[in-house]
Amino acid sequence: KSDVRRMGIGVRHAGDDGASAYRIPGLVTTNNGTLLGVYDIRYNSSVDLQEMVDIGVSRSTDKGQTWEPMRVAMTFGETGGLPHAQNGVGDPSILVDEKTNTIWIVAAWTHGMGNGRAWWNSMPGMSADSTAQLMLVKSEDDGKTWSQPINITPQVKDPSWYFLLQGPGRGITMKDGTLVFPIQFIDSTRIPNAGIMYSKDRGTTWHLHNLARTNTTEAQVAEIEPGVLMLNMRDNRGGSRAVATTRDLGKTWYEHPSSRSALQEPVCMASLIHVDAKDNITGKDLLIFSNPNTTKGRNHITIKVSTDGGMTWPLSNQVTLDEDESWGYSCLSMIDKETVGIFYESSVAHMTFQAVKLTDLVK
């Protein structure tokens, strides 16, 4: 209901810690119940890479009511004799290995490229001098400290691709323990395509098979039943989300019946999570989705719930959080069995956190 006013918490604002802007939220809940919000620290301006950008993390141990001082999880400083603004790293995606509580962040590091946009200036090849690098960091202490970056570009990038990067937001641990991050790549014909990458050995080695759909970019992944992954994609065709499923970790993909019809979008990042019936108060298997619920502009940030595997998203199962214009990116994570958290780019703070009761969402 639009007449309900919900309290949000501004976690990051323009100017905090001397940074011009904060963008690209990711959110996870660790095995200990800690909330970790991740984002770009865009020091000089709000523009995308290449720029002076690091990966920041905000941590909450009280279900999002208060947040610890920002930590820098990934930075490349003056690597290779180039200034910090020529070593930006951005668009983070974060996951919790639910078997070990190791937390992984994947981000794209760009080296050189002047001040051109990486989307157009990353080139085919494998080296940092030619193409963006896919970098991981991990935390073994619930998000307090982070490892040195690990370069997995050689494991997963095709040399003919112009740009390989993650799908910003979050990844998942599958029921069988497989770690999965959404990815996107600009292929040799300069068409972007969404997909996934996965690890079967707790994050040491990563694999990437086939694209889910052409001309798609930022995606989020959910395990809708054991071994079955759903990828919900930003589609450059506009108007509506693309949705595909795979049973073999991305070797083969099938268009979902809801694709390009059930969820409207203005061509923007969105969030999707699956919650098992046993893990939430409703006793139903839930898919929870958030995005700007519009086809024009980025406004009306809305959380929607489907109880039929993503086929329908009834109006009764929707809550609008922010009607005004913003950058519009969001990420969802369950806080406890009764509550979903959302970390999003709002009209009032660059990184806003809100907690919404499932009883308000599932009627």
Region locations from a protein language model:
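Asp-box/BNR beta-propeller blade signature and adjacent active/binding-site loops
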Residues: K1-K363
